[in-house]
Amino acid sequence: KNILDSSSLDDNRIIIDYYETSPKSSLDFSNNENDITWIQILSGRIDTYYPNTYIPGRRVDDTKIIFIKGTHHVSLDTPKGSSFIVTRIPNYKIHENDANDMYESDLRVVNWGNEPVLKSEHDDRKRVYLLSDSLVGTDSVKGELIVYPQSTSCPEHYHMGAEHYQFITSGSVFAVLDGEEKELNKFDLLYNFENEKHWFYTKDDQCKFVEFFVPGENKTIWTQTTNVCTWSPIGTDIRGKSPSRHIEKHVHGEGKNI
């Protein structure tokens, strides 16, 4: 099921499809030379195979993202059924900060489940980076998992130089865009255009959502300068284990070596 394409946007920077498979299903994906694609598992597990390469197949669960850059073919098996979203950025080089004329080829699994958890200094929200220049070798996209406990909010802000979307993976949250309020529930998608003021809050339910920025490099502007989103590492990954790396405390959008 297609859930976002150029018919909904001002351009074709993001294409998103949702898949739900039955047990023992197989799917094949081909990526073009000038595109990047990532596959995020929402439920179940996927066995991956990479025909005509020396890359070994592996089992992927909902703490990992399959990232494809350039010309590649990927085969997916879902032994017990699965749901996942496939996001593609056509001609990703136009979104890179310092792009060259070379289209790289890369295929990797990002184990974001072992990435460091960051906590907001002003409330109990948590953040985990899913895609970044350090993780996937391009700054054309940046992805994050955001966790909102009950009765939590973020300050109003907007972004210059990028558009982004939120996809709700569990729970519910209220989004306020330019003063208009909308409740979002599991598997809802919200798209934020550049310079569109927005903020979020929860009531009696907690919420988890992923958000992806295109381009990944952009500037966040806070409509009020108090309590801006500052994030500090808590020393564990999302499973409570030691993380794979350290990320320094930073204001959202201003971190280095993310």
Stretches found by the model and what they are:
Residues E20-T21, N31-T48, L145-P149, Y158-A175, ...:
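Short, conserved beta-strand element in jelly-roll/cupin
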Residues W38, N52-T71, G179-E196:
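Short acidic-glycine-tyrosine-enriched beta hairpin
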Residues V74-P79, F200-K203:
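Asparagine-centered strand-capping/turn motif at beta-strand->loop junctions
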